[in-house]
């Protein structure tokens, strides 16, 4: 399988560990990710001008050159999906293409890397790669953007793909009612107090389930729940100590890849206890 690969800005900044695990895992799954040359930001959280916002993603979609485009970031995925939907409008499409060197025909399909594993590869083909089934409990956290706007990949309200992946790796996906609730990352800069409130809700519920970790699919969610976890503990005078790991890191552990190659030593919340328990 081969995809045009759009890493997004975070993989070259705050999510180096995610980038490491994507490279380690997908090469072993024989899935080729051909990184788009000279890619640009998707527009991130919000760009007021609609034409500019859509054009940023359309430029990336046009660069896919006939392949489906895969991305590891929920925000990038959502923006690519929204751009595709918006470009059904012929007037907008013409305006956008006037600004692009490579015109976009509207036929590129964006996919999140979770969809690539769960649907395109499938758990049957993944199974032989799982050499060290994980004996842990894990929270499946999708975030607020992976299944929105609504698409055919998974349910926007009660998605199951990450739950099923966790189970396929030998771990137990715990029941988690906040699986699609916002982590607070998008408002961290403008309203840190509210952002920490939202993060606290997610972390406390995860702790109450008895889970060993929270599994995420988004670099912004990881940044909020890992890097800001100490701030949550300090603000609310509580102890969380909950490792936050990417789904690719979870796959890598089950495949027997070293924690260092997966970037698990780069997290702010220690993953040592999780790694030890997963390997028992």
Where is each model-derived feature located?
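Iron-sulfur cluster-binding electron-transfer modules in prokaryotic oxidoreductases
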Residues: 1-280
């Amino acid at each position: 399988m081969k995809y045009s690969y759009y890493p997004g800005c975070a993989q070259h900044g705050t999510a180096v560990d995610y980038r490491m695990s994507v490279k380690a895992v997908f090469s072993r799954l024989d899935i080729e990710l051909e990184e788009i040359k000279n890619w640009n930001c998707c527009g991130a959280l919000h760009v007021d001008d609609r034409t500019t916002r859509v054009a940023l993603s359309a430029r990336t979609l046009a660069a896919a050159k006939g392949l489906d485009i895969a991305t590891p970031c929920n925000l990038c995925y959502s923006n690519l999906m929204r751009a595709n939907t918006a470009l059904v409008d012929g007037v907008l499409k013409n305006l956008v293409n006037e600004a692009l060197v490579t015109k976009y025909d509207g036929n590129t399909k964006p996919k999140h890397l979770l969809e690539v594993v769960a649907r395109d590869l499938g758990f049957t083909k993944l199974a032989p790669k799982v050499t060290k089934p994980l004996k842990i409990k894990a929270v499946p956290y999708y975030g607020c953007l992976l299944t929105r706007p609504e698409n055919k990949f998974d349910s926007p309200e009660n998605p199951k793909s990450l739950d099923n992946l966790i189970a396929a790796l030998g771990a137990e996906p715990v029941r988690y009612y906040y699986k699609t609730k916002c982590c607070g990352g998008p408002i961290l800069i403008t309203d840190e107090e509210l952002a920490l409130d939202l993060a606290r809700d997610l972390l406390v519920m995860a702790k109450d389930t008895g889970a060993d970790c929270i599994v995420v699919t988004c670099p912004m969610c990881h940044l909020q729940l890992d890097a800001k976890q100490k701030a949550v503990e300090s603000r609310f005078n509580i102890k969380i100590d909950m490792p936050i790991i990417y789904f690719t890191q979870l796959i890598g552990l089950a495949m027997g890849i070293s924690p260092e190659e997966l970037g698990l030593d780069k997290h702010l919340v220690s993953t040592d206890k999780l790694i030890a328990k997963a390997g028992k």
